[in-house]
A protein has these predicted regions:
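N-terminal cationic-hydrophobic initiation segments that often serve targeting/anchoring roles
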Residues: 67, 96, 130-134, 168-172, ...
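Extracellular/periplasmic catalytic domains that process cell-envelope and extracellular macromolecules
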Residues: 45-48, 69-70, 98, 136, ...
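Charged helix-capping and loop-helix junction motifs
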Residues: 120-129, 159-164
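N-terminal secretory targeting modules
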Residues: 1-53, 64, 68, 224
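A short helix->loop->beta-strand "cap" motif at the edges of active sites that frequently abuts
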Residues: 137-141
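Catalytic His-Asp segment of secreted/periplasmic serine-dependent ester chemistry enzymes
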Residues: 151-225
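Conserved beta-strand elements of the Class I
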Residues: 53-55, 76
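Oxyanion-hole/transition-state-stabilizing segment in secreted/luminal serine hydrolases
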Residues: 60-69, 74-76, 85-123, 143, ...
């Protein structure tokens, strides 16, 4: 137990330093325009505490009017395209803690894989993210959405499945973190990925896919409206 606590505080120390010195994290300014857009929105009207915070990469960032899919919940989407799970560790205080969420929905890590980050590293970063939540936002429930397959990147599907399995097994007994499968709904009865669930790039989900995701996610959301 003491060893685990020491590791956590070491990670906090590293990321706090990174917040002070951008040069210590090589992706400190990655996709800065998207982040600045969110920060500008916040300056005009900062979201009130207690939202269900959706964060992650483009599969969530491109989910337009997310709240309309969940009319019985108050949702805040701060996902952005191209993000890695390590980016959310770096921007943790500003993109997560600052909003004082009542619940978090996370879908992130696939971009890390696509850029050469190992399966083990992605898994460790996701665990680190959840450990930080346990410290700064104790008791706040977290939904970890499964990495979804894309027809345009079939070679990556086995790696995505492996990460999904690691996450599912690791958090199966957690009272705070819930793994939710949004992968299975994208396959037809023949095991194929219908084009209707993807936009023209065959990478990102379509409106039809988001409707399916919403049906799966909604039962896991807290009542916060």
């Amino acid at each position: 137990m003491k060893k685990n606590i020491s590791i956590i505080y070491f990670l906090l120390f590293v990321y706090n330093i990174a917040n002070a010195q951008d040069s210590l994290y090589f992706r400190a300014n990655a996709y800065k325009e998207q982040l600045d857009n969110y920060y500008s929105m916040d300056e005009k009207d900062f979201p009130k505490p207690g939202s269900i915070l959706f964060i992650g990469s483009s599969s969530l960032g491109m989910w337009k009017n997310t709240g309309s899919y969940f009319p019985n919940h108050r949702v805040l989407n701060r996902a952005y395209g191209g993000s890695w799970i390590s980016d959310y560790l770096y921007h943790y205080q500003r993109l997560v803690v600052a909003y004082k969420p009542a619940q978090i929905v996370l879908l992130c890590g696939a971009n890390d894989l696509y850029n050469g980050v190992s399966i083990e590293r992605v898994f460790e970063d996701i665990k680190c993210f959840c450990r930080l939540l346990d410290i700064h936002l104790p008791g706040v429930p977290v939904i970890l959405l499964s990495f979804h397959p894309s027809p345009s990147m079939p070679d990556w599907i086995p790696k995505e499945r492996e990460v999904n399995k690691l996450i599912q097994d690791y958090f199966k007994d957690s009272h705070q973190v819930t793994y939710v499968d949004i992968t299975s709904c994208l396959y037809d009865k023949n095991g194929a990925l219908p084009e209707k669930f993807y936009i023209s790039d065959r990478l990102h989900p379509s409106v039809l896919a988001y409707k399916e995701f919403a049906k799966i996610i909604e039962p896991y959301l807290i009542n916060n409206k």
